[in-house]
C-alpha cells in the first residue's frame, strides 16, 4: 500500500511539474506574439504614413508638372 501511495504521489508531482512548465512556455509564447503584433502594427502605421506622403508628393509633382507644361505652351504660343 505504501508503494502505491509513493507511486501515485510521484506521478502527480511529475504531472504538476510538466503542467507548470507547459504553462510557462505558453505564457512566453503569448508574450512574444503580442510583441510581434505590436511591431507589425507599428510597421503598418509607418507604411500607411509613407504611402500617404507618396500620394501627396505625386499630387504636388503632377500639379507642378502641369503648371510647367502650361507655362511652356503659353510661352510657345506667345512667341508666335
UniProtKB/Swiss-Prot annotation:
<feature type="propeptide">
    <location>
        <begin position="79"/>
        <end position="80"/>
    </location>
</feature>
<keyword id="KW-0044">Antibiotic</keyword>
<dbReference type="Pfam" id="PF03032">
    <property type="entry name" value="FSAP_sig_propep"/>
</dbReference>
<comment type="function">
    <text>Possesses a potent antimicrobial activity against Gram-positive and Gram-negative bacteria. Probably acts by disturbing membrane functions with its amphipathic structure.</text>
</comment>
<feature type="propeptide">
    <location>
        <begin position="23"/>
        <end position="42"/>
    </location>
</feature>
<dbReference type="InterPro" id="IPR004275">
    <property type="entry name" value="Frog_antimicrobial_propeptide"/>
</dbReference>
<dbReference type="InterPro" id="IPR022731">
    <property type="entry name" value="Dermaseptin_dom"/>
</dbReference>
<keyword id="KW-0929">Antimicrobial</keyword>
<dbReference type="GO" id="GO:0042742">
    <property type="term" value="P:defense response to bacterium"/>
</dbReference>
<protein>
    <recommendedName>
        <fullName>Dermaseptin-DA3</fullName>
    </recommendedName>
</protein>
<keyword id="KW-0027">Amidation</keyword>
<keyword id="KW-0964">Secreted</keyword>
<dbReference type="GO" id="GO:0005576">
    <property type="term" value="C:extracellular region"/>
</dbReference>
<feature type="signal peptide">
    <location>
        <begin position="1"/>
        <end position="22"/>
    </location>
</feature>
<feature type="compositionally biased region" description="Acidic residues">
    <location>
        <begin position="29"/>
        <end position="40"/>
    </location>
</feature>
<keyword id="KW-0878">Amphibian defense peptide</keyword>
<feature type="region of interest" description="Disordered">
    <location>
        <begin position="24"/>
        <end position="48"/>
    </location>
</feature>
<comment type="similarity">
    <text>Belongs to the frog skin active peptide (FSAP) family. Dermaseptin subfamily.</text>
</comment>
<feature type="modified residue" description="Leucine amide">
    <location>
        <position position="77"/>
    </location>
</feature>
<keyword id="KW-0732">Signal</keyword>
<dbReference type="Pfam" id="PF12121">
    <property type="entry name" value="DD_K"/>
</dbReference>
<keyword id="KW-0165">Cleavage on pair of basic residues</keyword>
Amino acid at each position: 500500500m505504501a508503494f502505491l501511495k509513493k507511486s501515485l504521489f510521484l506521478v502527480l508531482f511529475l504531472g504538476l511539474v510538466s503542467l507548470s512548465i507547459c504553462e510557462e512556455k505558453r505564457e512566453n509564447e503569448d508574450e512574444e506574439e503580442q510583441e510581434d503584433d505590436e511591431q507589425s502594427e507599428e510597421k503598418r502605421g509607418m507604411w500607411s504614413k509613407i504611402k500617404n506622403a507618396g500620394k501627396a508628393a505625386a499630387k504636388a509633382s503632377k500639379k507642378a508638372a502641369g503648371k510647367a507644361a502650361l507655362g511652356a505652351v503659353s510661352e510657345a504660343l506667345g512667341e508666335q
